[in-house]
Amino acid sequence: MEKLAIPSVSTGNMLREAMKNGSSLGEKVKYYMDNGLLVPDEVILDIVAERVAQSDCANGFILDGVPRTLPQAEALQAKGVRIDHVVSIEIDDSVIEGRMTGRRVCSKCGASYHIVANPPKQDGTCDLCEGELVIRKDDAPETVRRRLEVYHEQTEVLKDFYAKLGKLRLVDGGQSIQGANEEILKAIGAKV
């Protein structure tokens, strides 16, 4: 995150990169993500541990997308991965569904759009390269609903886990991006 001068370690980005590379790990990841399932803990933790050990994470990092389960949180603790703050962005499922199912990605250059918040000039066509805009499989409505079910079943318990450790910070996700960013920075004690 630029304001904090530390890297954002996004498991989603790392997993999509693994899928793009077509490795055996990438094929496993693709199966899970295409079906709205969580990627197994051991795969996620190996990827994360390798990433946070890199030199650009020496002064801190932001974990995005992990931990998602209580065993992952406990395993990160056991591996000595220090987590100072956990930010939970609170928002209604219907809003999440609308945001995710409205996303479109250029099949050629990877540019991102949203049919409501950031529509292309011409429906279905990338403004930058005129490539076709597609819906990622993990943004399909049925996949999004399944991911939300999995979140409520497996991930929501982490709020209690981190609250007991005094690390949980709740942020209203229904506000503007700028407002949410400012609230996050305040919640973790950064200067706004």
Predicted regions and their residues:
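Glycine-rich phosphate-binding loop of ATP-dependent small-molecule kinases
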Residues: 1-192
